[in-house]
C-alpha cells in the first residue's frame, strides 16, 4: 500500500445550509486535500482528534484512502461499545456462568475507562456500572433492560471511543490500570489482575480475528503480568482440635446444624470441592453394612454444581451443572470414605429419611443447598469457637480450607502423591505445587535416608 507521512490537518470548517449546519474536517496528504463532513461538531471533533493522534503516533497515512493505516483495519469504524457487545454474544454459549460474570465485570471496567467524556451529573456512576455489568454485557438480560437502564446504555453508546483507541499505547495502559485496580484506586489481588488481563487478551485476539484490529496491543513478555502463587497458605490449615470444635459447634446449631455438620465432615474427611459436595446424591455414597467389620466406604464424585447466579446460567437456575474441574464431561473419580465419615453419613441419611435419588445435602425445601447458607454457618462457627486473633487470621477462613486440610493430612500421613492427586481430582504437578510447602513431619526420616548414602571415604 502507498503511504506517506506528509500530513497537515486544518481546523474544522462549518457551513450553514437549509438542512442544518455541516461541520467538515479537512486535511492535506502529500499535496492532496481530503474532506469529511459531519452533522455535528462533536462528531467532527472526534474524527479530527483521531487524525491528530495518528500523526502524533508517527503513523503512516494511505495515499489511496487518505486515512491512517489503523483506519484500514476497520478499527475507526467500529465503536468500542458495539464491539464489546459483539464479543459478549460470541463468547456467551461457549463459556461457563462464572466466566460470563468475569467477562462482564472486565468489559464494564474497560468501558468506563474508554468513555470520551465524564459521566454527567444526571447519571449515577454506580447505576451506570450496574447497567453495563448486569444488562449490556449479559446476553440473556440485555433486551430486558428497564427504560432507565436502556437510557444510560444509550448514553454510553454515544460517548464511547472507537476501537482505534486500542492503537494508542497510552490508552491501553489506562485500561490495564483500570482492570488492575479497585474503585478506590488500590491494587486488586494478583490472581484477579491475571484473570482480568486474560479476558482482555481473549477479547483483543477476537478483534484481530474479526479484522477490527491489525495486532493485539497488549504488552507481551516477562514482567507484563503480576506474579501469582497457587501454593496453600499454611496459616489457613485447621488442626484436629480446631476442626473438632468447629464441626461440633455446627452440629449443635439449631437450624440445619446436623445437615451442615455432615456436609463439612465430608469435606474434612474426603476432600471434595464445595461445588462437588452439593451435587452429590445419596446413590453416590457406597456405605458398608453397619455390622460389617470393615467400615470403609466410597464416594463417587462425578458432577459439580457451582453457584453462579440465575442471571448467568442458560436456564435461569442459581447453580450450573458442570463436569469435574479439569476433566472430561462424563469423567468421575472415587474417593475413600473413612469409618468416621461412614458413621456420620449413615446417621445423616437415616435421620433425614433420604432415598437413593435424593440430594445428599438438600436445602430446607429439598432444593440444592445454597452457598450463602454454607458460608454463613461456617463464619458463625469460626466466630464462636476461635479466639479473636484466630478469627482475624487466615485460619479456616474459607470453607475450601477444609479440602486443603484434608489433602495436606493425606500427604503428611504418607499417602503417595499420585494417589492423593487421583482422590482430589488434581494432576500430580498441580498437587505438589499447591501443597508441597505444607508437608511436614518427614524431616527426621529423610535425614536418615540421606545419611544412609554414606560420606566420602577418608583419603
Residue ranges with predicted function:
Residues 250-260, 270, 335, 343, ...:
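Short, basic (Lys/Arg/His-rich) helix/loop patches that form interaction surfaces
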Residues 48, 197, 281, 424, ...:
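DNA major-groove recognition helix of helix-turn-helix
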Residues 26, 68-206, 220-222, 379:
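Short, Lys/Arg-enriched alpha-helical recognition elements, typified by the DNA-recognition helix
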Residues 6-73, 328:
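Short, surface-exposed polybasic/aromatic micro-patch for ligand or macromolecular engagement
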Residues 433-459:
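DNA/chromatin major-groove-contacting recognition/catalytic segments
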Residues 184-199, 213-280, 292-296, 320, ...:
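Basic, Lys/Arg- and aromatic-enriched nucleic-acid-binding interface segment
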Residues 201-204, 208, 428, 439, ...:
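C-terminal flanking helix
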Residues 12-15, 123-133, 220-227, 242, ...:
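Conserved tyrosine-mediated DNA breakage-rejoining catalytic core shared by Y-recombinases
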Amino acid at each position: 500500500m502507498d503511504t506517506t507521512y506528509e500530513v497537515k490537518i486544518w481546523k474544522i470548517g462549518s457551513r450553514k445550509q437549509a438542512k442544518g449546519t455541516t461541520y467538515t474536517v479537512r486535511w492535506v496528504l502529500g499535496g492532496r486535500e481530503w474532506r469529511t463532513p459531519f452533522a455535528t461538531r462533536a462528531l467532527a471533533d472526534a474524527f479530527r482528534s483521531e487524525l491528530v493522534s495518528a500523526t502524533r503516533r508517527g503513523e503512516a497515512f494511505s495515499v489511496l484512502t487518505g486515512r491512517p493505516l489503523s483506519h484500514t483495519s476497520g478499527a475507526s469504524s467500529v465503536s468500542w461499545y458495539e464491539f464489546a457487545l459483539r464479543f459478549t454474544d460470541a463468547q456467551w454459549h461457549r463459556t461457563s456462568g462464572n466466566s460470563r460474570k468475569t467477562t462482564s465485570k472486565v468489559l464494564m471496567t474497560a468501558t468506563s475507562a474508554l468513555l470520551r467524556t465524564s459521566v454527567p451529573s444526571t447519571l449515577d456512576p454506580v447505576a451506570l456500572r450496574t447497567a453495563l455489568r448486569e444488562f449490556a454485557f449479559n446476553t440473556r438480560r440485555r433486551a430486558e433492560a428497564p427504560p432507565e437502564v436502556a437510557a444510560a446504555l444509550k448514553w454510553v453508546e454515544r460517548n464511547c471511543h472507537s476501537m482505534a483507541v486500542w492503537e494508542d499505547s497510552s490508552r491501553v495502559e489506562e485500561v490495564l490500570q483500570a482492570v488492575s485496580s479497585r474503585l478506590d484506586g488500590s491494587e486488586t489481588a494478583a490472581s484477579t489482575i491475571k484473570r482480568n488481563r486474560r479476558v482482555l487478551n481473549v477479547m483483543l485476539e477476537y478483534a484481530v480475528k474479526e479484522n477490527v484490529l491489525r495486532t493485539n496491543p497488549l504488552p507481551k513478555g516477562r514482567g507484563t503480568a503480576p506474579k501469582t502463587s497457587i501454593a496453600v497458605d499454611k496459616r489457613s490449615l485447621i488442626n484436629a482440635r480446631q476442626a473438632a470444635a468447629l464441626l461440633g459447634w455446627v452440629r449443635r446449631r439449631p437450624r440445619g446444624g446436623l445437615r451442615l455438620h455432615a456436609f463439612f465432615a465430608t469435606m474434612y474427611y474426603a476432600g471434595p470441592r464445595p461445588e462437588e459436595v452439593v451435587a452429590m446424591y445419596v446413590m453416590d455414597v457406597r456405605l458398608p453394612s453397619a455390622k460389617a467389620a470393615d467400615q470403609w466406604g466410597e464416594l463417587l464424585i462425578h458432577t459439580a454444581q457451582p453457584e453462579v447466579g440465575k442471571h448467568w446460567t442458560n436456564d435461569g437456575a442459581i447453580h450450573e451443572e458442570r463436569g469435574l474441574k479439569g476433566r472430561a464431561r462424563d469423567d468421575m473419580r472415587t474417593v475413600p470414605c473413612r469409618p468416621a465419615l461412614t458413621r456420620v453419613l449413615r446417621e445423616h441419611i437415616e435421620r433425614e429419611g433420604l432415598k437413593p435419588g435424593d440430594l445428599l445435602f438438600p436445602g430446607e425445601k429439598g432444593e440444592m443447598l445454597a452457598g450463602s447458607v454454607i458460608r454463613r454457618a461456617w463464619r458463625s462457627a469460626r466466630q464462636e469457637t476461635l479466639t479473636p486473633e484466630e478469627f482475624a487470621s487466615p485460619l479456616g477462613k474459607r470453607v475450601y480450607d477444609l479440602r486443603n486440610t484434608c489433602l495436606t493430612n493425606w500427604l503428611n500421613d504418607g499417602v503417595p502423591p499420585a494417589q492423593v492427586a487421583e482422590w482430589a481430582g488434581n494432576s500430580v504437578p498441580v498437587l505438589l505445587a499447591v501443597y508441597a510447602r505444607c508437608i511436614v513431619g518427614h524431616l527426621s526420616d529423610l535425614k536418615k535416608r540421606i545419611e544412609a548414602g554414606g560420606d566420602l571415604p577418608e583419603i
